[in-house]
Amino acid sequence: MALRALAAEHTKQTGSEVTFISGSPGQIQQKVDAGEKFDLLIMPTPALAALDTAGKLAAGTRIALVRVGIGIAIRDGAAKPDITTPDALRKTLLAQQKITYSDSKTGGLSVINAQKVLQNLGITDEIKSKLLPHSDGQGLIAKGEADLGLYNVSEIPRAKGVVLLGPVPAAVQAYITYDAGVPASSGSPSAAMDFLKFIASPAAAPSWLAAGLELAEP
């Protein structure tokens, strides 16, 4: 994971250890509301913005950190159709028999963004009969039971038998952006800001890219 690798590098440089606590946005918000103390929060923009508005973050510390877009997943070894332009992607999708993406119970924001890409392409109605939401859609692709899928780029390399064909074109892309900020209750705000600056720096970009994410635009 990019963040853990960056934390290890930061520890080598500074001696400052980083401990991770993972959870869904709702779980993290509950912990914060219950008074649990953190030194840095990284959450999808709407979730962290809500905490910021509620006064839970130190003023001026919230930044857009990284973002992830939708990519096309295909079976490893399958023919590679053209998705390099919106028109090419539109034709490729309409030519398929079954197209999968995460179901609403497991996919969260990636489901919404997969649907946004289809809306941006203007093919929501045309393609409806081809869509196959599934909790293990990438498994269906690997078995040949679906032709391709729309997933967060960061999720695709993890699946066995499935490869990333590429991200969808920028003109129809939909991103999930993750913000970061220092809680007002942090016991080590200076160390937290140092780490935040490190993971948001250009030097961190290759690590994020290797994990399918990119530094967010300012």
Predicted regions and their residues:
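Active-site acidic carboxylates
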Residues: 58
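Periplasmic-binding protein-like
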Residues: 39-42
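Exported/periplasmic ABC-transporter solute-binding proteins
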Residues: 1-26, 30-34, 45-55, 63-68, ...
